Amino acid sequence: MNDQYIGLDIGGTKILGALFDEEGKIIKRSKKQSKADRGEEVIFGQVCKVIDSLRDDSGRLAAIGAGVPGVIDHGRILFSPNLSWKDYPLEEKLVQRYSVPAYIGNDANVSLLGVWKHGIGKGCSNLVGFFVGTGIGGGIVVNGSIFGGSTGGAGEIGHMIVLPDGPLCGCGARGCLESLASKTAITKIFQSQVNRGRKTCFEELLSKEGYVLKSSHLKEAYTGGDSLNVEVMNRA
């Protein structure tokens, strides 16, 4: 049987997964909600549901890799602002459950690694990437190697304080870039403005509890000239 590999992007809103063959071609994909507000074991259960939905009898699962937001140390999630994992042994639990090697890294670092190895950054010795989603992450390649610093979070610009008296961030600080310009923050700003009587094309979406605006919605409304969207996005 041919070896197959599973890659996961574990975010604060959703978990994306893909099954790859030995040549790195995608065989199939899967997506589940993270359910990040329901506790660490519920999140792990969602991760396992994605993995189980991807497994294929035509090949042998050889390894699992995952990118997770936050501070990672040897496969343990020391802290993740957008998930309820704290000092959580994710790598160990995946190995125990699936009996294959598992590799866990900071999501921005592993995303940049993919861009550097296979995308527009291929061949570059030095590269910086920033990623905006539920939070804001960043990765750095220096002299052909991922530069993570002592805790693996050297590129984490999302937790740079840019407005000292700003909104409370998931990390516990105030005024982090993530608390001002992530999709979660942008959604909160929209909600606040709508509650004050401002008009936007997102009013129906924002009426759904816990809804986070999608990038495609923001882009469409921005190019369409939604005045509140243009104002909020330019500020972010």
What is each residue range found by the language model?
Residues 120-180:
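Glycine-rich phosphate-binding loop of actin/hexokinase-like ATP-binding domains
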Residues 15, 104-108, 162-200:
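Glycine-rich phosphate-binding loop plus the immediately following alpha-helix
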Residues 36, 40-48, 52, 59-64, ...:
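Glycine-rich phosphate-binding loop and adjoining helix at the ATP-binding site
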Residues 9, 65-69, 105, 129-135, ...:
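Short beta-strand segments
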Residues 30-31, 35-59, 177-179, 187-236:
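Adenine-nucleotide phosphate-binding core of ATP-dependent small-molecule kinases
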Residues 17, 66, 94, 186:
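Residue-level signal for inorganic ion chemistry
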Residues 2-45, 76-77, 152:
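Short glycine-rich, Thr/Ser-proximal phosphate-binding strand/loop in the N-terminal lobe
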